[in-house]
A protein has these predicted regions:
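Long amphipathic alpha-helical coiled-coil segments
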Residues: 60-70
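Short, charge-rich amphipathic interface segments used for partner binding and complex assembly
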Residues: 33-62
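Non-transmembrane amphipathic alpha-helical segments
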Residues: 11, 15-26, 49, 53-56
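Short, Lys/Glu-rich amphipathic helical modules
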Residues: 1, 27-38
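Short, charge/polar-rich alpha-helical segments
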Residues: 1-13
Length: 70
């Protein structure tokens, strides 16, 4: 769970790195099945981080993310 803006920025950087890694895999992996196997872990982690970012951004700075759940 992202707790502050510094953690948000770190997570945003990680998202960008993972996106670049998957984009690179698309160009270097010639076998579609191998590509999917290689990319699936990155994509799952991207989904998890994106959800964390969304939950953090949904909360107002005066409340904790768990208070903002609607």
């Amino acid at each position: 769970m992202i707790k502050n803006d510094q953690e948000l920025n770190v997570t945003l950087d990680r998202v960008r790195q993972f996106q670049l890694q998957v984009a690179n895999l698309r160009h270097v992996e010639r076998n579609p099945a191998n590509y999917r196997l290689s990319a699936s872990g990155y994509l799952a982690e991207l989904d998890r981080m994106t959800l964390e970012i969304r939950e953090y951004l949904w909360s107002h700075p005066t409340e904790t993310p768990s208070e903002a759940v609607a």
